[in-house]
Structure formats: C-alpha cells, structure tokens
Amino acid sequence: MPARLEVYYRETVVPKLMERFKYKSIMMVPRLEKISVNIGVGEAAQEPKLLETAMQELGQITGQKPQVRKAKKAISNFKLREGQAIGCRVTLRRKIMFEFMDRFISVAVPRIRDFRGLSDTSFDGRGNYNVGIREQIIFPEIDIDKVPRINGMDISFVTSAKTDEEAYELLSLLGMPFKKKNQ
C-alpha cells in the first residue's frame, strides 16, 4: 500500500503543477527523489558514546539504520584525526521517504518552539531544499527523558525540479509550512 503523501502527490499535486507550469508530459513534473537526514556529532571525537546515541535516535526517527560518517581530513584545532567517526546519515527513498515527510510536516514541525514557518531562502539554486533542526526531541519517536544530549540535524529534500520556484511550489503543495512571502 502506498504512503498517504505519495497518493496525494500523484492525485492532487501533479495535476496542479502541470497546470501551473504548463508541462506537456507527466514525466516533466518535478518529484521528490530522496530525503537525506544528517546528524553531525563533533564531540564524538572525545566521547564516542555520543555518536552511538545519535545513531540510535536517527534510526528511531527514520526507521532505517544510519551510516557512520568519518572525518575526511585531520584538523588539530578540533582534536580531530582523519577517518574518525564524527556523524551519521540516512538517505530515504520511495515509500519510507514519503512516510517520513508526512510525519515531519504534520507532527514534528508543529512541535518546534516559536515556529512561524520554514525559511523559503534555503533552496540551493538547483531545486533542492535544506532545513536545519535544532532539537531531535520534536519527533514523537524520541523519549525526552532518555535523551542525554540535545542534537540538531540537517534535512535535505532533493527534488528533480530544475528551478527553485518549481521546487518551492512542489514542496508547498505537499504541505511544507513555509513562511508567508510578506513576513
């Protein structure tokens, strides 16, 4: 059974985008290709247990086993050696991606403190959107009492859109709560 947001995309979003941008074929309509969730734990160089808890939390949030990310080069000021584990990442595709985005938009984002909308300036010029989250406890899968340290995370929404305008329209039609243009 397809995810709720995936069905909504096919039945509602695609026709609206075809009408708005005058696409001749359904294959020209931008689509969400993947979502990448990354947690950087710089302190893992001194305390490896922090990386383990971050990986466990990321696994709970996404439902997928995280991949360990290692330092590309040594930086002595940060007491960091090349090849040292300093973060974790998950790449979500297809059904799991739509389910995560649905939970992110409808459950997690409304739990952000003093939330007034996501910034619409975080597009990269190629139709991809990046958002930084300051606390992992906005996700209901995380038990606040068992969190030893508040971690932030970076979430990248990779789309097949050619321009930022197309990507903005796609994500806003999918329900992404952007700030109003006049604010």
Swiss-Prot record:
Gene3D superfamilies: 3.30.1440.10. Pfam families: Ribosomal_L5, Ribosomal_L5_C. This is Large ribosomal subunit protein uL5. One of its GO terms (cellular component) is ribonucleoprotein complex. Part of the 50S ribosomal subunit; part of the 5S rRNA/L5/L18/L25 subcomplex. Contacts the 5S rRNA and the P site tRNA. Forms a bridge to the 30S subunit in the 70S ribosome. It comes from Chlorobaculum tepidum (strain ATCC 49652 / DSM 12025 / NBRC 103806 / TLS) (Chlorobium tepidum). HAMAP family: Ribosomal_uL5_B. Belongs to the universal ribosomal protein uL5 family.
